[in-house]
Amino acid sequence: MSKEHVYEIGGINFKGYFAQANSNEAPCVLIAHTWAGRDSFVEEKAEELAKLGYHSFAIDMYGEGKIGSSVEENSSMMQPLLDDREELAKRVLGAYEYVNNLDLVKSNSIAIMGYCFGGLVSLDLARNCSELKGAVSFHGFLSGPEENNGEKINAKVLALHGLKDPMVGQDQIDSFSNEMTEKNAEWQLHVFGDAMHAFTNPEANDPEFGTVYNQKADQRSWKMFTDLLKEIF
């Protein structure tokens, strides 16, 4: 099967990246990208997951596979979706439905993981898709939409957070914890004491901006994630 898949949502073409596991009918893990777009970072994660026996699909939240090249460009692509969580949910649900209909993917056996902005995308899919099996956020934004649908969250939820992340304050943590509890989710929040934002990205090295790679947090969070996949599937 080809790596790049074009799927349409609301008249816009989106370009996802599919990494195929050795087995034919297998579960699939969606990967939601950072604010930079569907770049090589998430494609490499997709290939890693395929080696572990899971099909993986790096979704495109911006359309046409757009990738930003600066902080300003990344922000300009991400912000409209943060401002319109209904549109954000529509796009990630569209990706879920596309993948769920692929012959190679075991029906209704899908989880999602995401980084930074993609962490929020992952959690929003859990908030809006009752069939989702798991949702994992790596140093992601935790705040829910202003319009709370109040529906129970069926997916197993794992949030992996750096204590020194300046982009996610205690207010987000408290709000997330209350929401997950109110929605009867099976949820976990792990805090890495010495980690900042983007702790899984080896290229992150900007303490003033709050983004710094942390090898131990990277390795430990990946193990927690893959252990959850084994439990789910």
Range-by-range predicted roles:
Residues 1-233:
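N-terminal cap/leader regions of alpha/beta-hydrolase-fold enzymes
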